[in-house]
Amino acid sequence: MQKRNRRDVVPHPSIETGPMIKHALSVTRQADFAAWYQDVIAEADLAEESGVRGCMVIKPWGYGIWERIQTVMDAAIKDAGVQNAYFPLFIPLSFFEKEADHVDGFAKEMAVVTHHRLIADSKGKLVPDPEAKLEEPLIVRPTSETVIGAAMSRWVQSWRDLPLKVNQWANVVRWEMRTRMFLRTSEFLWQEGHTAHADRDDAMAETLRALEMYRSFAEDVLAMPVIAGEKPENERFPGAVATYSIEAMMQDGKALQAGTSHYLGTGFAEAAGIRYQDRDGGHSLCHTTSWGTSTRMIGGVIMTHGDDDGLRCPPRIAPHQIVIVPMLRDNGEDAAILDYCRDLESRLKALDAFGEPVRVLLDTGANKAQTKRWGWVKKGAPIIVEVGPRDVAGGNVAVIRRDRLYQESGKLNSAFVAKGDFIADAAATLEDIQASLYAEARERLDANIRRDVTDLAAHFSGEDRFVGWAEVQWARPTGGALDRIVEQLKALKLTMRNTPLDAAPADSACIFTGEPAVERVLIGRTY
């Protein structure tokens, strides 16, 4: 395969790769990971700040990624027999007051509506009308267990109505004090599944099914390896009996909780009155579950796959998997180039990858070809194809794989390929990019979970910015003993992430108490 070496690469030192490379971003990951993250969001045109504190505008490319997440996950949700529905944004305060642990867990984050009308005051400013105060305050949805529970209490009468499984795609509001786009915002988009069951075993099976759905989605679709496990008692969802999570390792070694699944026992059912008549004529409380994931996954994709040139978007969630950039020069050759590109676009769209038609964009915008190329590099389009007059004459295309942007020399890795050969291999190339991104992230995760740590303070202190996670053995203490451990970890800016479901059995003493350990728990810094 013949290489095309671009001359527009002006060298400067690359911390990561060694060769002299001019990267597309002004901030590198190693120099300032937090600033790099914000730079990727801006340069990849994913989102921007809005005029509302803690709320963001998700731009078309970012929302396109969310739509891809919705499309694939919605199919998985429906395959499990779950139906979509929609429930109110406003929830009466009394609904929350029925479940004390639940309201305590969310009280500090709740946005409250108290009036239903505005009037002009003596200075002409709009203020709430004192005569329009609501009889009962309404909470702007932080999560929907209470309002969906109220509906379930009407829908469930008999054992024949169970299991009842619903999901909604919606926005939620949690008044975050320290916000960061896609990771912590006062308003975010998500899906939340809610189910009711006749007994604990069926509800637990659903809880673990949802967890496995999230694990599979993260790894197979987002190319983001995760650890699935149960949350310690102090990290449980408010009011839950058990909470499970998937935890992903970002490139700075911090953990990102990317999805959760909760077994709620009968507490929420009792508060909402979700009862059913069993086969013998008796009445029992339902066992309920809830599970959800959100636009936070996009933040995870950025910090798992992004590089110093922007986002690298896994093909399965890329709004456009292949972008064709015609190299036009406002002359007589342009018509032939566009015809050549349209034929290429048509033939690529006829292909399937990952069981779906290949998503192709022919970029005919007014920007110069070089500007378009680097714009798509920063957005993370998996494959960028450039076509100029020489390519038309030779029956070729110039192909850039976003996961292999540079040659070993540090020059842009743009390769001449025969047009027919590129089309024949396009679907396989997309699948190879997906696998390559996952393998890279998997290697990083596996290499940075330490299982030999005996002193957390020593391990997580010092100058090293990247320390990954520690998997340690513990006795699963409760009450005051657990509270003291949480405070010790907090002083080190650490948290317990989860107890991995596939971890080796405990065979030593608890790192915190010295008592015989019963399981292993992941410790790390987190977003």
Swiss-Prot record:
<dbReference type="GO" id="GO:0005737">
    <property type="term" value="C:cytoplasm"/>
</dbReference>
<dbReference type="Pfam" id="PF00587">
    <property type="entry name" value="tRNA-synt_2b"/>
</dbReference>
<keyword id="KW-0030">Aminoacyl-tRNA synthetase</keyword>
<dbReference type="InterPro" id="IPR004499">
    <property type="entry name" value="Pro-tRNA-ligase_IIa_arc-type"/>
</dbReference>
<dbReference type="InterPro" id="IPR002314">
    <property type="entry name" value="aa-tRNA-synt_IIb"/>
</dbReference>
<dbReference type="InterPro" id="IPR006195">
    <property type="entry name" value="aa-tRNA-synth_II"/>
</dbReference>
<keyword id="KW-0648">Protein biosynthesis</keyword>
<keyword id="KW-0963">Cytoplasm</keyword>
<keyword id="KW-0436">Ligase</keyword>
<keyword id="KW-0067">ATP-binding</keyword>
<keyword id="KW-0547">Nucleotide-binding</keyword>
<dbReference type="GO" id="GO:0006433">
    <property type="term" value="P:prolyl-tRNA aminoacylation"/>
</dbReference>
<dbReference type="InterPro" id="IPR033721">
    <property type="entry name" value="ProRS_core_arch_euk"/>
</dbReference>
<comment type="similarity">
    <text>Belongs to the class-II aminoacyl-tRNA synthetase family. ProS type 3 subfamily.</text>
</comment>
<dbReference type="InterPro" id="IPR004154">
    <property type="entry name" value="Anticodon-bd"/>
</dbReference>
<dbReference type="InterPro" id="IPR045864">
    <property type="entry name" value="aa-tRNA-synth_II/BPL/LPL"/>
</dbReference>
<dbReference type="GO" id="GO:0017101">
    <property type="term" value="C:aminoacyl-tRNA synthetase multienzyme complex"/>
</dbReference>
<dbReference type="InterPro" id="IPR036621">
    <property type="entry name" value="Anticodon-bd_dom_sf"/>
</dbReference>
<protein>
    <recommendedName>
        <fullName>Proline--tRNA ligase</fullName>
        <ecNumber>6.1.1.15</ecNumber>
    </recommendedName>
</protein>
<dbReference type="GO" id="GO:0005524">
    <property type="term" value="F:ATP binding"/>
</dbReference>
<dbReference type="InterPro" id="IPR016061">
    <property type="entry name" value="Pro-tRNA_ligase_II_C"/>
</dbReference>
<comment type="subunit">
    <text>Homodimer.</text>
</comment>
<dbReference type="Pfam" id="PF03129">
    <property type="entry name" value="HGTP_anticodon"/>
</dbReference>
<dbReference type="InterPro" id="IPR017449">
    <property type="entry name" value="Pro-tRNA_synth_II"/>
</dbReference>
<comment type="function">
    <text>Catalyzes the attachment of proline to tRNA(Pro) in a two-step reaction: proline is first activated by ATP to form Pro-AMP and then transferred to the acceptor end of tRNA(Pro).</text>
</comment>
<dbReference type="GO" id="GO:0004827">
    <property type="term" value="F:proline-tRNA ligase activity"/>
</dbReference>
